[in-house]
Amino acid sequence: MRKADLVVGVQWGDEGKGKIVDMLGLNYDMICRSQGGHNAGHTIWVDGVRYAMHLIPSGILHKNIVNVIGNGVVVSPDVLIDEMAQFDHLEGRFYISDRAHLNLTHHGLIDQAKERLKGDKAIGTTGKGIGPTYADKISRSGHRVGELLEPERLCEALMSDFEMNKSLFNALGVKIPKRDELLEELKRYKEALAPYITNTTRLVWKALDDGKKVLLEGAQGTLLDIDHGTYPYVTSSNTISAGACTGLGLNPKEMGEVIGVIKAYTTRVGFGPFPTEDKGSDGDKMCEVGKEFGTTTGRRRRCGWFDAVSVKYASRLDAVDKYALMKLDVLDGFEVVKICKAYQYNGETIDYVPTDLENVTPIYEDLEGWDSVKGVTRYDDLPKNAKRYIERIEELTGVKVGLISTSPERSDTIIR
């Protein structure tokens, strides 16, 4: 039996997992999503064409790869149907877990209303209803994709839920759908999605038992994990590598190589602690050159220097075997590049991530910059200072950099 390999984000998401999955995916028979929803964005550049996806695994661009949305994902039918329309002949190469939970219109409306009511205490959610959907799941009041196969029954269950929560809907100013309109919507979902709904756990098991190569595609990043991230400024699922097991029905012994994806700098969307954030011209340059605007929301990402402390912490949580270092070219032209090697915390120097990360001050190490790495495909051809930067990341985190991206194009990648 083969083991499933995993690509996981090791920062606050947006590390460039899509490009790595797209590139490595050519060597796999099946690619699976295990958690998150359409709050996650996958951006891939192929031959100068930009593909942005939020639910469908990146392997969908290759017609010989089977793509799976696992039980740990929360699925917006509207978003999924729109994404599916971009691709031809999905039959036999795309499947949705019947156990994945439904992210419906009212979840997004509730999410947005709660954020508005929080005012300056808002978390910075994408407003896509991910949190409310997972909340319904945990409270055992949610509904799953498999229920779409019986739209009349699901409609009655939802109307009952709405009636039970009428006071909450009214307080938030969220309009309860009309039964007839809801039923028509659910029937439309069934018609579009029914051919792809199945027990994906058995599907993945069979693939592994048959010796197929399976790749798991993580969403968001480790520092957004509901348990181990910068709570409450986190997502609503387990983004660490162990979440891939529960989100697909795999056991830990079925996990193979873990590839941790990191940017050569650091970004974050929304609120929450960010020790190495640069609010000056350097951060602005990273944002402009790196085109740091969210795939899902279009929001400008906060930018700053590489944080080796948080990456080392996340890498331990994920059991990372090697890194894929992304966007090294964005740092081209900086006279000095910085790496956070430790934190100042309560008068002490520490090399770990405390629970109250907002109370740390980064301790930087300055390294000399380089002119350009753009388009380089051989490690030996990199400038000396760029190599030193990569080696210093390895020294501080204890993990080897195995892949290096030097432009958005799939082909501009160094494999060591």
UniProtKB/Swiss-Prot annotation:
It comes from the Bacteria. Its cofactor is Mg(2+). GO terms for cellular component: cytoplasm. GO terms for molecular function: adenylosuccinate synthase activity; GTP binding; magnesium ion binding. Mg(2+) binds at D14, G41. It is found in: Cytoplasm. Pathway: Purine metabolism; AMP biosynthesis via de novo pathway; AMP from IMP: step 1/2. Binds 1 Mg(2+) ion per subunit. The active site is at D14, H42. It is an enzyme of class 6 (ligase). Substrate binds at T295, T296, T297, G298, R299, R300, R301. IMP binds at D14, E15, G16, K17, N39, A40, G41, H42, T126, R140, Q220, T235, R299. GTP binds at residues 13-19, 41-43, 301, 327-329, 405-407. Its EC number is 6.3.4.4. HAMAP family: Adenylosucc_synth. Plays an important role in the de novo pathway of purine nucleotide biosynthesis. Catalyzes the first committed step in the biosynthesis of AMP from IMP. PANTHER family: ADENYLOSUCCINATE SYNTHETASE. Homodimer. Belongs to the adenylosuccinate synthetase family. This is Adenylosuccinate synthetase.
